[in-house]
Amino acid sequence: VLFTSYDSLNRVYHALEPLSDNYPLLKQGEHSTGSMIDKFKKTPSVILGTNSFWQGVDIPGDALQSVVITKLPFDVPSEPITEARIEELRRAGINPFRNYQLPRAIIQLRQGFGRLIRKKADRGVVSLLDSRIINRSYGKQFMDALPRGTFANNLGVVKDFFKNMGREQSLATPDLNKIISLHSRDSI
């Protein structure tokens, strides 16, 4: 599960912890990235990570079949470097959202998608829980930048995908439903 903030990661971790008997939770910050990936490859589990997990993590094959992206990965505008860049673009008469923030978020989202499909034979589901990809005018730019695939907006399609792969995951039972209910209630 990819997050854009540690606060969101921690809230979801604490909500899912009581439900994690079948799939241990591997939380960024409690283990090194390398040890988390090793554990993940050996034992069915769930990785909860932020920035460093959006890129450079390579888990090809059957070990990774689902990536959940909780929120579109826009840089936080109040972070000093981002804030300075936005102000610089504004002074130059350039729209910082369209010409800086949006392109960076699109690249980051593509990187998040890339965690799932590393080789031609890899298959899986990316679940994007941020409705802005559908509800905002810039959502089409995100969609156009994503790899080809089947896009759906209901869990039935996800269940069918895993069923057809011969793996009836508990993906659509308490854990994912809990994430989705947290998302709709708290806006992860």
Predicted ranges, named:
Residues 1-188:
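ASCE RecA-like P-loop NTPase motor cores
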